[in-house]
UniProtKB/Swiss-Prot annotation:
Originating organism: Chlorobium limicola (strain DSM 245 / NBRC 103803 / 6330)
Gene: argR
Family that this chain belongs to: Belongs to the ArgR family.
One protein family per Pfam: Arg_repressor_C
Pathway: Amino-acid biosynthesis; L-arginine biosynthesis [regulation]
InterPro entries in alphabetical order: Arg_repress (IPR001669), Arg_repress_C (IPR020899), Arg_repress_C_sf (IPR036251), Arg_repress_DNA-bd (IPR020900), WH-like_DNA-bd_sf (IPR036388), WH_DNA-bd_sf (IPR036390)
Protein name: Arginine repressor
Organism domain of life: Bacteria
Lineage: Bacteria, Pseudomonadati, Chlorobiota, Chlorobiia, Chlorobiales
Function of the protein: Regulates arginine biosynthesis genes.
Assigned keywords, A-Z: Amino-acid biosynthesis, Arginine biosynthesis, Cytoplasm, DNA-binding, Repressor, Transcription, Transcription regulation
Nuclease among keywords: no
Length: 148
């Protein structure tokens, strides 16, 4: 199946159903006649920017445009435990399993001072464009994690 058609169907499923996890999404896609491997679905979800969001009946998968920025900021703030740096990089410690979401959130901000992020299970490595601007990048990250 064509990637664009599959991703369009994924968007449609997320708009029509409260999907709790990727396993449920695979089941819905199969019911619609679309067979997809879990690894392929995971890549599609990443490319589409799909995140876990608090819904009426618990957490669900959601497209980024369904979530106002302040809600995402609030969720990310709860997941961040600490922000530290040395003279070269910034390290963000998160709750277990939440580093990818925090890293993706920072990537979506597209700040020109951030060269890139690398996320593990509970740690995000933030690489600034210039080490001379680490304090400004930390301030920017803190501002964008605040609920205000």
């Amino acid at each position: 199946m064509n990637k664009q058609v599959r991703q369009s169907k994924i968007r449609e499923m997320l708009h029509l159903h409260e999907v709790g996890n990727q396993h449920d999404l695979i089941r819905l896609l199969e019911e619609a006649g679309i067979r997809v491997a879990q690894a392929t679905l995971s890549r599609d979800c990443s490319e589409l920017g799909i995140i876990r969001s608090k819904g009426l009946n618990g957490y669900r998968l959601a497209l980024p445009e369904e979530n106002p920025g302040n809600i995402i900021k609030g969720l990310v703030e709860v997941e961040v435990l600490s922000i530290q740096s040395n003279e070269a990089v910034i390290i963000i410690k998160t709750l277990p399993g939440r580093a990818h979401g925090v890293g993706s959130f920072l990537d979506q901000l597209k700040n020109s001072q951030i060269l890139g992020t690398i996320a593990g299970d509970d740690t995000v490595l933030v690489i600034p464009v210039s080490v001379a601007q680490i304090s400004q990048v930390i301030s920017y990250i803190q501002e964008n994690l605040s609920k205000n």
